[in-house]
């Protein structure tokens, strides 16, 4: 009979294990509610050994949330193929997968809870927002985005973040509906901006020309057309004068 010998982990391997264990615990409870003792027990090591790999609780929490931030930013990566609406819908699916899997940790990352210093948390989430912004700009195929386009994309990224945080508080709206709604929100933000700027109008028209009727943007137009006849017209005296 052969007796198994427990392999000793290297320093980096052990650090990565502890980060993974911490993230798993953060998926169930807020980071500030998770103790080093719990992380040590889940990793199968002693509390002093945790401090051998991380100088303090703060450094372990920062490392764990940094990995979460990197993973969240990666959810916005998408091949540059197919209509934009379908691409954004896939991105939102992966984004909400992350939110669903790491609820308390996601909230802590976005809100900069006491487990992580505010400056560190802000730097992490700013990195996620910038990565998301750059990905969307790349999908739009605009080398030098005008100011209005930057405003649209950054506003939409913030909207996705806020929507996810609100959804986590009770999950009162079906997730799939929110994913689609956020894609529609992007189209709406872009369309409103296009109404004020010729360059934005050109970008929006180019995007819509590549969208199929059964895609997310086509669905939005169908929904708007469906209720348009029932909307009372604006009285002539209330229309803005040109």
Which residues make up each language-model segment?
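Short, Lys/Arg-enriched C-terminal cap helix and immediately downstream tail that follows
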Residues: 62-63, 73, 190
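Alpha-helical DNA-contacting segments of helix-turn-helix folds
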Residues: 59-68, 109, 124, 128
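Hydrophobic alpha-helical connector segments
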Residues: 63, 77-104, 142-146, 179
């Amino acid at each position: 009979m052969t007796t198994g010998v427990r392999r000793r982990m290297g320093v980096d391997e052990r650090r990565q294990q502890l980060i993974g264990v911490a993230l798993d615990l953060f998926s169930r409870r807020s980071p500030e509610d998770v103790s080093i003792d719990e992380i040590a027990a889940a990793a199968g090591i002693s509390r002093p050994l945790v401090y051998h790999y991380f100088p303090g609780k703060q450094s372990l929490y920062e490392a764990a949330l940094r990995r979460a931030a990197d993973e969240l930013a990666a959810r916005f990566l998408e091949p540059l193929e197919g209509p934009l609406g379908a691409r954004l819908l896939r991105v939102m699916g992966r984004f909400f997968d992350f939110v669903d899997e790491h609820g308390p940790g996601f909230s802590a990352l976005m809100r900069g809870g006491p487990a992580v210093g505010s400056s560190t948390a802000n730097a992490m989430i700013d990195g996620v927002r910038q990565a998301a912004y750059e990905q969307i700009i790349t999908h739009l195929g605009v080398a030098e985005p005008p100011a209005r386009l930057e405003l649209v994309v950054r506003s939409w990224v913030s909207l996705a973040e806020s929507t996810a945080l609100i959804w986590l508080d009770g999950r009162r709206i079906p997730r799939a509906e929110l994913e689609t709604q956020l894609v529609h929100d992007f189209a709406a933000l872009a369309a409103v901006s296009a109404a004020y700027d010729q360059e934005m109008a050109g970008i929006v028209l180019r995007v819509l020309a590549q969208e199929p009727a059964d895609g997310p943007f086509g669905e939005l137009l169908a929904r708007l057309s469906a209720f348009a006849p029932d909307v009372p017209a604006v009285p002539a005296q209330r229309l803005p004068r040109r």
